């Protein structure tokens, strides 16, 4: 599969062959859902906590005698039916992450890249190395394409690139080692450098 390579001025400077085993995979929404849910579960902090009856400070004495008061019998003021009492079956601190097969994770990344490629929302850039900080140059580049948001994936990026893009709310920089399904699906257009393409082919094959 032959795709054009562009430069930062949006000029076509050559072509590159994309491996169809990565960029032309059948659409699998079930796989995408599995990988996205796995990523979101790993992202959860799991610090939610409600106090049980053993966590609440206060007296442990019986509030009043068992009989002859006309009221329902009670054994503790820390019980859940009282104001300031415990929470029954409340959330506890735990880890929400779970394991997902490596083959499924790889397939999810292939499906996500293939989806963007099939929708003509995948661009191949020769390089994003710049010698100076210039947000205007990046802005002019992305305005050549009618997309709402951009994810730029490169082998590595220098400080000038980071400073040029960080003030643009619809542009996200990502190192190739951090390529993931969630970020690909959240952005409208994916921009891969030639180095990132080679890395992904080695990683996913």
UniProtKB/Swiss-Prot annotation:
One Pfam family here: Ribosomal_L4
GO MF term list: rRNA binding; structural constituent of ribosome
Cellular component GO terms, alphabetical: ribonucleoprotein complex; ribosome
GO biological process, alphabetically ordered: translation
Gene3D superfamilies documented for this protein: 3.40.1370.10
Region annotation Disordered: where it falls in the sequence: 56-78
PANTHER family linked to this entry: 50S RIBOSOMAL PROTEIN L4, LARGE RIBOSOMAL SUBUNIT PROTEIN UL4M
Subunit structure: Part of the 50S ribosomal subunit.
Family: Belongs to the universal ribosomal protein uL4 family.
Function: One of the primary rRNA binding proteins, this protein initially binds near the 5'-end of the 23S rRNA. It is important during the early stages of 50S assembly. It makes multiple contacts with different domains of the 23S rRNA in the assembled 50S subunit and ribosome. Forms part of the polypeptide exit tunnel.
Stated name of the protein: Large ribosomal subunit protein uL4
Organism, as annotated: Ehrlichia canis (strain Jake)
Gene encoding the protein: rplD
């Amino acid at each position: 599969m032959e795709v054009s390579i562009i430069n930062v001025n949006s000029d076509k400077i050559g072509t590159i062959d994309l491996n169809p085993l990565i960029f032309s995979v059948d659409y699998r929404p079930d796989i995408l859902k599995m990988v996205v849910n796995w990523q979101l579960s790993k992202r959860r902090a799991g610090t939610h906590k409600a106090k049980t009856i053993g966590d609440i400070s206060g007296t442990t004495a019986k509030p009043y005698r068992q009989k002859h008061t006309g009221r329902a019998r009670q054994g503790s003021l820390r019980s859940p039916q009282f104001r300031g009492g415990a929470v029954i079956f409340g959330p506890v601190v735990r880890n929400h992450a779970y394991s997902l097969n490596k083959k499924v994770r790889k397939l999810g990344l292939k499906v996500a890249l293939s989806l963007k490629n099939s929708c003509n929302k995948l661009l191949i850039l020769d390089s994003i190395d710049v010698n100076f900080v210039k947000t205007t140059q990046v802005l002019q580049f992305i305005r050549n394409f009618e997309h709402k948001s951009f994810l730029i994936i490169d082998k590595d990026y220098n400080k000038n690139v980071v400073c040029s893009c960080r003030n643009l709310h619809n542009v996200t920089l990502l190192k190739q080692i951090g390529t993931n399904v969630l970020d690909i699906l959240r952005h409208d257009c994916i921009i891969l450098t030639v180095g990132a393409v080679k890395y992904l082919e080695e990683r996913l094959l």
